[in-house]
Regions:
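PLP-dependent amino-acid enzyme catalytic core
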Residues: 8-346
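Low-complexity, intrinsically disordered Ser/Thr/Pro- and acidic-rich segments
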Residues: 1-9
């Protein structure tokens, strides 16, 4: 067993919390239990360094990329989906699940639903990524296209749940979802125990809260930085104001996986308590990071998946000389958007 490596049986070790559950929605025990449940379905994803990327970053930074874009369905959200479906009762599964998504949450739920024979209904906004829509349908999900953005599609999903009595699988406001996201950081803590910092993109905040929960318990020296698209900055703005926020205008970013316009009650208090800092990056910065990943790692990522690296580029003076982990959260970019990025139209 390598240094810093932990293994959990079906009954993980008890590790005391450092904050009340009212602030932190999950514990390390919850994440360990989620990992045990999803282990048969979700392989450990690579955590890999690239000397050519280090050279491009400069400032004596060494970076490791957590390749969630290599997962089944191409994103970290499959962890969340299996964490949720393996925790539901038989009766909850029988009634089916309903969710709103811009794609990756829905793909994960459709994949897990097909695995367990659970009916899945997904609500997406009009004009959603057509390739993500195609993928969800291919996995057997019922797709409802309604609303101008994620938040309006979420309202549609809540209406369907009230009418049909199904289970609402919220992409953030669910402890099983957050615990599933935390399994990624549990792997990171074991794969590279000597990190100084993690840089993580934030939409609703499940990744970041999962990461902070793990690092506070296992690697308390690791500082977690959050980054959000400037065109969808409700959580960033609320964090700096120390107050929950909902914006009336639709999110505007090609990083559709981050395109939300509100904070969420289960994640926002922990984000306020635990983050080292929270920054925004423009679509141009995200597109630059995406092209850099294509050139230096030869892996395909979507806008949300490149946002962590965009954040590291913005923070590279502050993180000079450090060992930094960056989550590549997904790779489901459609061909039209990829063409625009490669042609420097974004």
């Amino acid at each position: 067993m390598g240094p810093g490596l932990l293994t959990f049986t079906s009954t993980p070790p008890m590790i005391p919390d450092t904050l009340p559950r009212s602030v932190w929605p999950i514990t390390l025990d919850d994440i360990a239990a989620a990992r045990d449940r999803i282990r048969p379905f979700v392989p450990v994803s690579p955590f890999r360094g690239y000397p050519v990327l280090d050279a491009a970053l400069g400032n004596d930074i060494r970076v490791w990329l957590k390749h969630e874009n290599f997962n089944p369905t191409g994103a970290f959200k499959i962890r969340n989906a299996f964490s949720l479906l393996t925790a539901l009762s038989d009766e909850e599964r029988r009634r089916g699940i309903v969710a709103a998504t811009r794609g990756n949450h829905g793909l994960g739920l459709a994949y897990a639903g097909k695995t367990f024979g659970v009916p899945v209904t997904i609500c997406v906004p009009l004009g959603n990524n057509p390739e993500k829509n195609e993928g969800m349908r291919a996995l057997g999900a019922r797709l409802i296209e309604e609303g101008k953005d994620y938040d309006e599609s979420l309202a549609v999903s809540e209406r369907i749940v009230r009418e049909a009595g199904a289970y609402l699988a919220h992409s953030t406001n669910n402890a099983h979802i957050i615990a599933g996201a935390g399994t990624m950081s549990l792997e990171i803590a074991e794969q590279e125990p000597n990190l100084d910092a993690l840089v993580i993109a934030v939409g609703g905040g499940s990744q970041a809260v999962g990461a902070m929960t793990v690092m506070r318990a296992m690697r308390p020296h690791v500082r977690v930085y959050a980054v959000q698209a400037a065109g969808a900055s409700a959580t960033h703005d609320g964090w700096h104001a120390r107050a929950p926020r909902v914006t009336a205008t639709p999110a505007t970013t090609f990083a559709d996986g981050l395109a939300t316009r509100s904070t969420y009650e289960l994640t926002f208090p922990a984000l306020c308590d635990g983050l080292a800092d929270f920054i925004t990056v423009t679509d141009a910065q995200i597109a630059h990071a995406l092209r850099l990943l294509l050139r230096t790692t030869h892996t395909l990522v979507e806008g949300a998946g490149a946002t962590g690296l965009a954040g590291l580029l913005a923070l590279k003076e502050r993180l000079a000389g450090q060992r930094v982990g960056v989550v590549v959260s997904g790779g489901n970019i459609d061909d039209q958007t990829l063409r625009r990025v490669v042609n420097r139209e974004i």
